[in-house]
């Protein structure tokens, strides 16, 4: 899909750009520079809205409301007419990722016999789970209520994302499968989980400028790690600074600055496979702007 050209901005005018992302510590870390005005762009003013990822997925699917929005890669085919992917700001699992956990030790094959709580049907975690085993029965539960629901015995197992990947064992739960590890073993690729999408209608020059601003924000956070982590800690649910640092390190790194050729290949592979398996009804047309 081509990006429409754009006229040069009028001198002294300020263009307002709305950005939406999740209140997760990794997202907060990468947007630290922009959110705190450490990164400024002449002629542009950025506003930030924080919302959980499933809400952002569904909002972007319904309308191109935000100029830039965090999304799960699974959601992209549903909004690709209005949005394109940014070449930076992604979170990928390097042999790790969302996990299915349970209150007792079980084998991955046992998941087909139980109902699994999932954080949303547009999350990439859900897509990976269905590629792994399309027969698994699921029910949507708010992501921060999945572990409590398993402990209460409401569900035999749950698909956990975000910080739950680091804290589940302290709740006495057991890992049935790490979908990031399974994906790496199956495809040899990283598991792309979430990225940032930008409205196509903004045009090529704003795409370039905003992409640079986000990349500069990520680089600033990586270069000023202590301050960025302190900022991100206010969004880190139930994590101490050590675990927050570990979680951010997992999902904000050089891959966040640029997916790399194999990272972009992984995005296409994941979505194409989802389409081939009948999980995604729309043929993906993946493109990136830098």
Annotate each language-model stretch with its function.
Residues 85-108, 131, 184-201:
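Hydrophobic/proline-rich hinge and linker segments of small-molecule sensing/allosteric domains
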Residues 264-267, 272-290:
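Long, low-complexity C-terminal extensions of enzymes
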Residues 17-18, 82-91, 115:
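A structural signal for short loop-to-beta-strand junctions that line the ligand-binding cleft
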Residues 39-50, 132-145, 280-286:
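A local structural motif
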